[in-house]
């Protein structure tokens, strides 16, 4: 488990772009984290004022940050940066709205040098909200 201070020590992101609130579990190749979605998120001012929905690209960013925490929590990667390199097979299945708790999982499926590929899922109340295959590079 990791609290927000430990997450901030791993990731360079800060408000309003830090999209991981807590890590529930982490192993060598798998992580489970949460994002508590509130009406106070700045993106709800424009997406959409009368029908607030979390933008799908920000759900994918939250998943990428979750995978980033997994990669950057490894001793050999401390102090490095993770760069988003691609997304494939992305699907959005459920709207994410204020009051939802996004449960995010990422599992490494392939690694070659500094490039890693993860399967990522975001769920709300046990139902799939979004999923995809994310590629990223770990650099200096």
UniProtKB/Swiss-Prot annotation:
User: Per its UniProt entry, which superkingdom is the organism in?
Assistant: Bacteria
- Write out the catalytic residues in the record: 47
Q: Which GO terms describe its molecular function?
A: (3R)-hydroxyacyl-[acyl-carrier-protein] dehydratase activity
Q: Which GO terms describe its biological process?
A: fatty acid biosynthetic process; lipid A biosynthetic process
Q: Which reaction does it catalyse?
A: a (3R)-hydroxyacyl-[ACP] = a (2E)-enoyl-[ACP] + H2O
What Enzyme Commission number(s) does the record list for this chain?
A: 4.2.1.59
Location(s), subcellular: Cytoplasm
What keywords is this UniProt entry annotated with? Cytoplasm, Lipid A biosynthesis, Lipid biosynthesis, Lipid metabolism, Lyase
Spell out the GO cellular component terms annotated for this protein, sorted alphabetically and separated by semicolons: cytoplasm; membrane
What broad class of enzyme is this?
Answer: lyase
Known InterPro entries for this protein? FabA_FabZ, FabZ, HotDog_dom_sf
Classify the main location.
cytoplasm
Q: Relate the protein's function as given in its record.
A: Involved in unsaturated fatty acids biosynthesis. Catalyzes the dehydration of short chain beta-hydroxyacyl-ACPs and long chain saturated and unsaturated beta-hydroxyacyl-ACPs.
Q: Which family does it belong to?
A: Belongs to the thioester dehydratase family. FabZ subfamily.
Mind telling me which PANTHER family this protein's record contains?
Answer: 3-HYDROXYACYL-[ACYL-CARRIER-PROTEIN] DEHYDRATASE (PTHR30272:SF1)
Instruction: Please give the name of this protein.
Output: 3-hydroxyacyl-[acyl-carrier-protein] dehydratase FabZ
Organism per entry: Streptococcus pyogenes serotype M49 (strain NZ131)
The opening ranks of the lineage are:
Bacteria, Bacillati, Bacillota, Bacilli, Lactobacillales
State which gene encodes it: fabZ
């Amino acid at each position: 488990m990791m609290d927000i201070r430990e997450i901030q020590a791993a990731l360079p992101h800060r408000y309003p772009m830090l999209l991981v609130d807590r890590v529930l579990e982490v192993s060598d190749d798998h992580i489970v984290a949460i994002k508590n979605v509130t009406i106070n998120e700045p993106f709800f001012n424009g997406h959409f004022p009368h029908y607030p929905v979390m933008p799908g690209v920000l759900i994918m960013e939250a998943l990428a940050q979750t995978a980033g925490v997994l990669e950057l929590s490894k001793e050999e990667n401390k102090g490095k940066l993770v760069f988003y390199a691609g997304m494939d097979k992305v699907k959005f299945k459920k709207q994410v709205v204020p009051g939802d708790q996004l449960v995010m999982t990422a599992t490494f499926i392939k690694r070659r040098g500094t490039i890693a590929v993860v399967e990522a899922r975001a769920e709300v109340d046990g139902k799939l909200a979004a999923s995809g295959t994310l590629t990223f590079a770990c650099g200096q």
